[in-house]
Design a protein with these regions (language model features):
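Short secondary-structure boundary segments
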Residues: 98, 121-123
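Hydrophobic, well-ordered beta-alpha structural blocks that scaffold small-molecule cofactor pockets
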Residues: 1-97, 102-113, 129-154, 160
Length: 160
């Protein structure tokens, strides 16, 4: 008996490059962070963003104590400086890590100044015009999903 299997050989580097193009990772995406608290600074310090073409160009906060402090070489600026910064710099993506009472106001400023992509970690869902992409991130929902999966795993493996 002869078994014949079909073997497909893939050029992994080529596939990686092509998938990167589909995801838009073949260009640099300048981005800013609004909110320089714990989450904002953690995101600012995440070096893998740059490896994927996301370049941090500005960090903003409302707290004057943080003004001028550098995070990875970028000085924290005041939120009041944001409109001028957006006029003078190319920014594609804004990351919101602000309290919910500031998020909607800042989102409006971002949208009014041409930002087309917002990654929102504020504890409020943002609505935006059709030409603006918003990714509302809910950390607690992700944690609940993990909890559910853990619970299901335990049920399946009880008594083993």
């Amino acid at each position: 008996m002869v078994l014949v299997s079909r073997v497909t050989v893939y050029n992994v580097r080529y596939l990686y490059t092509e998938i990167g193009k589909i995801l838009g990772l073949d260009t640099v995406h300048p981005m800013i962070i609004l909110g320089a608290g714990n989450l904002g600074q953690a995101l600012a310090n995440y070096v893998d963003f740059e490896k994927r073409g996301f370049k941090l160009v500005g960090i903003f906060d409302v707290n004057p104590v943080l003004e001028g402090i550098a995070v990875r070489g970028i000085e924290i600026q005041m939120l009041s400086d944001l409109p001028l910064f957006l006029k003078e710099n190319e920014v594609e993506i804004a990351i919101l890590t602000l309290p919910k009472n500031k998020a909607k106001e800042m989102a409006k400023i971002l949208i009014d100044n041409g930002i087309k992509a917002i990654w929102n970690f504020a504890h409020i869902d943002l609505d935006a015009p059709e030409d603006v992409m918003v990714e509302n991130v809910h950390l607690s929902e992700s944690l609940m999903t993990l909890s559910y999966n853990l619970s299901e795993y335990r049920k399946e493996h009880e008594g083993m």
